[in-house]
Amino acid sequence: MRVAGGRALSRGAELRVPGGAKHGMCLLLGATGVGKTLLVKRLQEVSSRDGKGDLGEPPPTRPTVGTNLTDIVAQRKITIRELGGCMGPIWSSYYGNCRSLLFVMDASDPTQLSASCVQLLGLLSAEQLAEASVLILFNKIDLPCYMSTEEMKSLIRLPDIIACAKQNITTAEISAREGTGLAGVLAWLQATHRAND
């Protein structure tokens, strides 16, 4: 799978990011109900198991109505700040010290694409995020959908967005519920937050 001007990953592919970004936090953003909380919980599980073993049933979640800080520890500790989708109007208050951004979209719900695209464009145009590495995650690939992920990317003109953005952007298809692609997300986070000693 290829994306003009950016990087794309097939399911389970390895994510690579060049170093050089400033130290800081990872922001986890996306509309309400896209699976951000489950993603963070699953990333914790994957990092604690070193990517081995079955993840089992997904843990219970509820919509985030504020902010959650979660530490992911593998080769080094990475703090992920998850902001609830309902907090979209004030996300910009949390952009400072952001080294990386995980933006989650629901691949099973094409009707939500336009709203997610508007949010993404707002993030990419923010000066405070100009140097942040961005990973756009198409979550819920385990659920049936009448559009393929490639059709969704084309519909929101993602290749054009990536070509015009200041940020280094990578895309991936994942299933937080099943664990598909999460080892790659963890590897991307580790590479992005590599210490500059």
UniProtKB/Swiss-Prot annotation:
The UniProt-reported impact of residue 37 to N is: Loss of the inhibition of RIGI-mediated antiviral response activity. Loss of GTP binding activity. Loss of interaction with RIGI
Provide one Gene Ontology cellular component: cytoplasm
Predominantly, its location class is cytoplasm
Q: Which cysteines are joined by disulfide bonds?
A: none
Family matches, as SMART domains = ARF (SM00177), SAR (SM00178)
Taxonomically, the superkingdom here is Eukaryota
Keyword Nucleotide-binding tagged: yes
Where does the UniProt annotation locate this protein? Cytoplasm
Pfam families in the cross-refs: Arf
Q: Tell me the residue numbers annotated for binding GTP.
A: 30-37, 82-86, 139-142
Biological role: May suppress the RNA sensing activity of RIGI in a GTP-dependent.
- Protein family: Belongs to the small GTPase superfamily. Arf family.
> What name does this protein carry?
ADP-ribosylation factor-like protein 16
Q: Which gene encodes it?
A: ARL16
